């Protein structure tokens, strides 16, 4: 995207996501976007452009932008195939109007976008209060910042074992930024947000789940918070790792049973590794076999996690 945008330039920049689509479809999308951006008014457009220029400058919370969110829904209606849906909606309903931490597998930069759209389509209040924990890469370009604006985000440093972009920061600076981000996350939970955490810490290149990071238990300190596991499929093809364009695919979000964070922590004796492995097993339980990865049925050293999953997450 160009650094300075007028309404026409924004529409043209957005359609670069759609390279490879037929000309008629792109023209229809271009017309719909131009109409809706104009209808939103100059104030909404100016606010969006300012956000594109400034978001990500601090380890802080960035709210959703209404116009960006609407644009994403317009695109989703034309990109997500008809079979795209949410399964286990009764579990989403059980988490309504509660502080909740959603733990998901991580396949692409479009995961949070698809989850927001699918929650919106089933009328869940979680869509409107979704706030994703986001690493620095999410803010590294205008295109990625635009994609982040249809939900709230909290910028956080990546785990030191995975980080590349934060290499210029000292360990002390990373720790300070992480503490600040966690404090902000707790504030957003108290304000009623639904936190979305990709606890693998990075996107999976094999599509299979990677080991959950034990440090993600820091988001579970709120006494009455729920844990809601979800497994996403399809986004690995929608916006592949290394790709720059969106592809028309079927995406499915499969939700598991929500559990009180307090109960899991008590049952696990506050063992951070066991807590996160149990959540990993809960995510794997709703995913197809090829996506279970480190938490598949054949993996060893997960007996305690499987026992807790059976006790707490299974109906």
What is the predicted function of each stretch?
Residues 133-135, 156-158, 222, 230:
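Generic beta-sheet signal
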Residues 117-124, 218-224:
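Short, surface-exposed basic-aromatic patches at helix termini and helix-loop junctions that form
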Residues 90, 106-108, 134-139, 201, ...:
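Short, flexible loop/turn elements at secondary-structure junctions
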Residues 97-99, 127-129, 192, 224-227:
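A general structural motif
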Residues 70, 151-166, 258:
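Short, basic/glycine-rich phosphate-binding loops at helix/coil junctions
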Residues 2-29, 165-315:
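Non-catalytic C-terminal accessory region of glycerolipid acyltransferases
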Residues 1-101, 106-121, 127-128, 138-145, ...:
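Membrane-anchoring hydrophobic helices of lipid-metabolizing enzymes
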